[in-house]
Amino acid sequence: VSEEQAKQFAAANIETEDSEKQQKLTAFIRQLNIDEAEKLKGTDFSNAKYPFDTLQAKTTASSQSIRNALTNENRIHSVIYNLPYSVVAGDYSGNISYNNQTGYIFSDDRESSIVINGLKTDSQAIPSIGSATYTGKAFNGTYLNTYDWNSHESKESIKEGLLSYIIDFSKRTGSGEITGLGDTIKLHSGIIQDSNISASAEQGYKTGNYSLGFFGKNAEEVAGKVIFNGKDTVGFGGQRGEIQK
């Protein structure tokens, strides 16, 4: 907190009870960090436009054929997952065949790019004792197709996967999984290096790798991507639960 920010907080809390000041100071500092992270994300990813912990997709052009649970399509689109301290932005373009109920990809000829930005955690600020589970969402650019019996129309929404990732801060390792995008994606154990983890990934018969970074002043978040067949395929992010010591 800068001297100017400290003065701002003091002026706004002259009449605040002493018992409430610490709580308000914590909230004040958190908001300062969120504001700093928003600037680092870039002007395209404002928190007003992209609410926290929500997947948002925008299609520029598409053509598709759907037969029951099978979707074959050519789509140009972006998927954004915004959290307080990080943003995961995926761009996809090209042909793909997938199960529109499970999100499982049968064939993938898309060009893709997944970029992660935000307030990176300083390596010295990552906790050194205990363990914690990070939970959040993931995407692979597939869509869930549903039928509305009231309107008699088919509707689609971006398919959401779920991330669960455990960090053992004492051992400096992390591993986890992503469910809800076809077969479970296993994120095998990797070692914390600086403020990042990189290790192998597996989904059924497919093998690849993943990378993630820590975000927030105190490693409150992780955000990263999974690479299969040499290209960015899955984006993910998660927020930290309580550290168990």
Give the location of each predicted region.
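Mature soluble binding/inhibitory domains
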Residues: 1-245
